[in-house]
Regions:
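A short beta-strand-loop-beta hairpin characteristic of the jelly-roll/cupin
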Residues: 45-75, 85
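Short histidine-centered beta-strand/loop micro-motifs
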Residues: 18-24, 41-46, 63, 70-72, ...
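A structure-centric signal for secondary-structure junctions around beta-strands
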Residues: 27-29, 48, 96
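A short, N-terminal "cap"/entry segment at the start of jelly-roll beta-barrel domains
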Residues: 1-27, 128-140
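Conserved metal-binding segment of the jelly-roll/cupin
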Residues: 35-38, 73-93, 100-104
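Double-stranded beta-helix
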Residues: 88-140
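Short, charged/polar surface micro-motifs in flexible loops or helix N-caps
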Residues: 26, 37-39, 58-60
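Conserved short histidine dyad/triad with adjacent acidic residue
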Residues: 9-18, 29-45
């Protein structure tokens, strides 16, 4: 699983208990994402823009309703994703990838993650459900 370190604003996340290192009324969120080899994030979208910068290796970003497009980013490349576009990413390296991520909007504007229907189906098959607020959680 990937680790998500919130630097400015909570931004978009499934773990409601996370607190950012820098609090305040910022119009953007900054995070560092640690992604183990072969791991990443499945197709999803946000209500605001998102920008990725892989800091220590390559990163594969895929997008489109069926993930029909993809690009391999090199270290320090930048990739900007517009509002509402289904996207995902993967670490193709043999080491942990660290990604600098910026998401537009305040915590209130960002909203929740919108998962692709296929991702929701896989999550439910693996024992996850959505709570009353729309967040994924274990059935237990």
């Amino acid at each position: 699983n990937k680790n998500l370190y919130k630097i400015i604003n909570k931004g978009v996340l499934e773990n409601k208990g996370v607190e950012p290192a820098i609090e305040g009324d910022h119009r953007f969120g900054v995070s560092l994402i640690e992604i183990p080899p072969g791991q990443g994030a499945n197709l999803h979208s946000h209500e605001t823009e998102e920008v990725f910068f892989p800091l220590n290796g390559k990163m594969i970003v895929f997008w489109g309703d069926q993930a029909q497009y993809q690009v391999e980013l090199n270290q320090w490349d930048c990739f900007s994703v517009p509002i509402g576009l289904m996207r995902g990413f993967k670490n193709p390296n043999e080491h942990i990838l660290i990604v600098y991520s910026v998401v537009g909007g305040t915590d209130q504007e960002v909203g929740k993650i919108t998962w692709h229907p296929n991702v929701i189906k896989l999550a439910e098959e693996s024992g996850l459900i959505f709570d009353q607020e729309g967040y994924l959680k274990d059935k237990k």
